[in-house]
Amino acid sequence: MKNFYTDSTFLSFELQNEYKEFSFSSMDKKDNNFSFEMTSFENAFLFGLLKKYKPTKILEVGLAAGATTRMLVDHVFKQENCSLFSCDLNNNYYRDESKRTAYLALDKYTPDQKKWHLLTGKYLPQYLNYIGGDIDFCILDTVHSLPGELLDFIAVLPFLREGTVVVLHDVNMPLIWQDLPRRNAHSNEVILDSTVGEKIICKDPNNFGGISNISAVVINKDTYKYINNVFSTLSFSWSYLPNQEEIEVYANHYLKFYDADTEEYLRNIYFLQKEMLERVNNTKNTKKSKENFINKIKNLLKKSVL
């Protein structure tokens, strides 16, 4: 394991504490009790990477309330030559539709289309031509369930330069959260394990066994050479089915940067995943109908006894 992973020694406890303070001091007092979707350790990991690699073009995919976005914008505005592109499919915050996506960042900053570009309401491939290439730092933190971030990673790879750091959040969500409904939230773990490149993983002292919920991979020439390893994982069982429009957007995008076989592979996998998920849903509905029928009979028997 030690030979496979990079020991993130730049992530000292001092650095973790520094960014713990930064993460809260950068928020207004009214937001201090907000439940951040990254812990102080995970923020330290992220900003430790920024400090070490000094990127000039950052892509953030998945914004939620915008706590991490706000810290990233704060970082970018302090750098002389650095820009941030923040993307999310949702125009409004998924937990509270009355608020805009990234509202915590918007409370303090206004997108200026120079240092900070806020892009919401479309799928990632629909923004990539606008964003352009030479991205040297990328954060993937969206739905966490397959196909989720896997589709986005394949889409964005042609726009990443060699040496780009790709940060993957919630790589061990089912283990860390012990949340049964999210037990299949493996999309970023799948990306981490199937992508060829230098892996950056650090032990989190706050979790049992030091298991970390955030990791990174550094892109190199072999990442592109062995991208079929990543494509192959599209055959893993999906937790949800994207709509037809979404699949068309991604399939057409892949066709521009990969061979026709990969685009056809996505379409074939989509068809098979659709068949499987429909069978799963039908089984669930049948089981529920049986349970309802049994409960109805039980209630009738109780009434007849009374």
Where are these regions (language model features)?
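Mobile, glycine- and charge-enriched loop segments
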Residues: 1-44
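S-adenosylmethionine/decaboxylated-SAM
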Residues: 32, 43, 47-301
